[in-house]
Amino acid sequence: MSDNPQEYELDWDVEKRLKLNDAGLVPAIVQADGTNEVLMMAWMDTHALAYTLATRRGTYFSRSRNEYWIKGLTSGNVQEVTGVALDCDGDTVLLTVKQTGGACHTGAHTCFDNDVLL
């Protein structure tokens, strides 16, 4: 099994349901297994989703770095993926994960804990 997400191809039955944006990406919402707390939002392409499904490791595409990002590979804050679902339109992916350490790149438990607006 390769550690290069780009070598993974998404099953056609899944891929034909996805509605990717013009950049070939789909938003991925990540929730904590057991509590359903929203931890983060990231982007995936078909290779990142295929790699995630094959390895159960949260894998995303960084738009700013233009590269794949396997959550926790450098930080140790890994995501064991326990569930993956598409929304009714196929334009958003929902991942359920067992999170080790912080989910946010800042090290915080969630990316949504700093600026509560309401």
From Swiss-Prot:
Keyword list, A-Z: Amino-acid biosynthesis, Cytoplasm, Histidine biosynthesis, Hydrolase, Magnesium, Metal-binding, Zinc
Subcellular location(s) of the protein: Cytoplasm
Enzyme Commission number, as recorded: 3.5.4.19
Cofactor note: Binds 1 Mg(2+) ion per subunit. Binds 1 zinc ion per subunit.
GO annotations of cellular component type: cytoplasm
Keyword Transmembrane helix (UniProt): no
Ranges in coiled-coil conformation: none
Residues binding Zn(2+): C88, C104, C111
Pathway: Amino-acid biosynthesis; L-histidine biosynthesis; L-histidine from 5-phospho-alpha-D-ribose 1-diphosphate: step 3/9
NCBIfam families: PRK00051.1
Record's protein name: Phosphoribosyl-AMP cyclohydrolase
Organism: Corynebacterium glutamicum (strain R)
Gene: hisI
